Amino acid sequence: MLENWIKPQIPEEEELEERLHAARSKLSVLQMQIKEHGLPVLVLFEGWGTAGKGSVLGKVIKNIDPRFFKVATMDEPTEEERRKPFLYRYFVKIPANGKLEFLDSGWMDEVVKDVLHDKIGEKEYKKKIESVKRFERQLTDNGYLVMKFFFQISRKEQKKRIEVLKENKDTRWRVSGDEDWQNKHYDKCMHVFDRYLNDTNSPADPWYIVDAKNRKWAELQVLETLVSGIETALKNSNLAVPLLQNVFPLEKIPKLSEISLDKELSEEEYKKELKNLQSKLSELHNKLYRRKIPVVIAYEGWDAAGKGGNIKRITGALDPRGFEVHPIASPLPNEKARHYLWRFWNRLPKTGHIAIFDRTWYGRVMVERLEGFCSENEWQRAYNEINEFEKELSDWGAVIIKFWVQIDKDTQLARFEERRNTPEKQWKITDEDWRNREKWDLYETAVNEMLKKTNTTYAPWHVLESNDKKYARIKALKIVIDAIEAALDK
């Protein structure tokens, strides 16, 4: 893109000022429409050091009510961020509906720096490019406006700006070794930048090259492009998104009705196995921490199937400093106002730690689907988005273990009645549980489709036969141990 880029002609000063005034006014009006329509806008500023990203950003945000936007400067990842997936620190920054988020440098800057300084090779570069493309596409598919600007200046212009900044003691601090290094290796940087821009350019979120030699002209290009992009997004906000074909390897899994639930353990067998398996898991937890391998354990299942007791037998073997259990309920207002995966990105473990989810992102294709909390296009799209999310975790190095806790309808009824008739257990049963029970067949259809479409080789499902809770608990412990041992043996 940069190598074939034709520099636009700068308008005369009078025209420039007129267009600046018009664009600033228009953006001020559009911010209210963004709020009214609930349009989330993510704006990424990338480019050469000293190209003026910060100063243009400062000019642009003067036209927006500060209650409706945030600005984040993405420096080098912190130690904590390095222990999370590559995209973690960007996904958690996405704006809520009706808000704008400006990023002064972002995922492009991180990737190209790693390439330029030989921190990643070709294979890792391609993997990160795929991650970026999936990330950006998921945002735009879910109604986000993503606008990406690259500020372009010549080698000569950059060198001149570096020298001017260095001459003034009050601005000298703004020049780091990065700018000098870029200028010295300008051609190499140009090639890497150009390749990245080409690799991540798409019709849904294209790159806009900003001629940044003149500051006012750069501001005008950004403002007019923002205005045009926002107006288009507001007009097209209700268009359905085409469904993508799944490209991830799937394994066959039986339907729930085909699974026998008569498996059980005696109390004596259960106690013996529980003690041995918990001791084994405790040892493995220490090894996980030393090897810095993250683990994500996801629980789904019927109400009263025994998820809580199952989780308790796993956590009973773990160092409390190295795990966290996340009970997932209906999304809070700030969670509902963002991409549905946002609240799960926020709860990911750091390397060496374990995150256990009691209910998960699969709510999108179960309760949200059946209760009408999302459109058919949205839940149909979610299968692929979830596979992508889990692929991101797998590529990061996470062990992903997914459990469906299965019981039959009669067993559920017996447990519901026991809860209703036992004072200390009454808090466990709600009217919603009874309503969901009435939709058993609909839920079973949805669960079977979920299992079929998301049973990937890197994040397979495990069905726990839980008519006998003791059997299910022991089976879960064995599966967790086997998965962790396999990861440690790699």
Where are these regions (language model features)?
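Glycine-rich phosphate-binding loop of ATP-dependent small-molecule kinases
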Residues: 1-490
